[in-house]
């Protein structure tokens, strides 16, 4: 099962694999990775032993079950799959039966919400749907307790963090880059995309934040973690 070690470790985010089977959202295309590059990267991860990064998938694309699961199994790897309940059974996305199949294969199911919305802008009704109802549905389908969440678009603030803690989640996985610790609620991840060269991939595998990215990252962290934020209504 998926568990972030107490010592700091890199955590990777993958999205879609292979040719998309649904209409993509604006700006989503670069985050789709071909099967061959994905398999080559898994081979590198499998050779890293105790230093290997953790693996996560966002959005619940059909490629999670068609490509990711068999390739992970072939290498003895596991991952966390952060799923969108509102996309289940839609073309190009996982089915309800696929959620159970992932769980039965030893993979961890996490919450990505219901409709891929900005969690900072939720009103009480939205929080009910995105957090509680979606979580219950995933628990019913997977047979697992849903204790991990990943913020859509990597967007969160102090209010989102407080709400998830109050709801009993163990961790919020972000898109902030860097290394994650199992001792902390907020856990940064390193996003893999099709434009990355070998140097960028190596930095992601290690969780190293490049110097050119550090000022923007620090500013983003300050905004997300220090500003109060809150719902739109």
Feature-to-residue mapping (PLM):
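N-terminal pre-catalytic segment of deacetylase/amide-hydrolase enzymes
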Residues: 1-53, 219-233
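Active-site-adjacent pocket scaffolds in enzyme catalytic domains
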Residues: 2, 77-110, 114, 158-233
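Short, charge-rich binding segments
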Residues: 3, 70-75
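Metal-dependent polysaccharide deacetylase catalytic core of the NodB/CE4 family, i.e.
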Residues: 9-24, 28, 51-54, 73-160, ...
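Soluble or luminal CAZymes and related metallo-dependent hydrolases
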Residues: 33-37, 60, 91-94, 126-133, ...
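Amphipathic alpha-helical segments that form well-ordered structural scaffolds
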Residues: 37-44, 67, 71, 133, ...
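Short acidic, Gly/Ser-rich segments with clustered Asp/Glu that frequently serve as metal-coordination loops
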Residues: 59-67
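Short, function-defining helix-loop hinge/capping sites that tune catalysis or transport
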Residues: 66-67, 120, 197
């Amino acid at each position: 099962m998926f568990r972030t070690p107490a010592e700091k470790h890199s955590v990777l985010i993958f999205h879609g694999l292979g040719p998309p089977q649904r209409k993509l959202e604006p700006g989503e295309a670069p985050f789709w990775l071909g099967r061959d590059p994905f398999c080559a990267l898994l081979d590198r991860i499998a050779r890293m032993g105790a230093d290997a990064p953790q693996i996560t998938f966002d959005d619940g694309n059909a490629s999670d079950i068609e490509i990711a699961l068999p390739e992970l199994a072939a290498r003895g790897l596991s991952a966390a799959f952060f799923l969108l309940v509102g996309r289940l059974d839609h073309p190009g996305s996982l089915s309800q039966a696929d959620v159970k199949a992932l769980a039965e294969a030893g993979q961890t199911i996490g919450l990505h919400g219901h409709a891929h919305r900005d969690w900072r802008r939720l009103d009480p009704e939205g929080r009910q749907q995105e957090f509680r109802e979606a979580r219950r549905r995933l628990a019913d389908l997977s047979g697992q307790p849903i204790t991990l969440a990943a913020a859509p678009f990597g967007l969160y603030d102090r209010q989102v963090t407080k709400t998830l803690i109050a709801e009993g989640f163990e961790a919020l996985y972000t898109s902030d880059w860097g290394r994650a610790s199992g001792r902390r609620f907020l856990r940064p991840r390193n996003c893999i995309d099709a434009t990355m060269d070998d140097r960028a991939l190596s930095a992601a595998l290690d969780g190293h934040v490049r110097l050119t990215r550090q000022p923007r990252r620090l500013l983003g962290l300050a905004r997300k973690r220090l500003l109060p934020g809150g719902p739109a209504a």
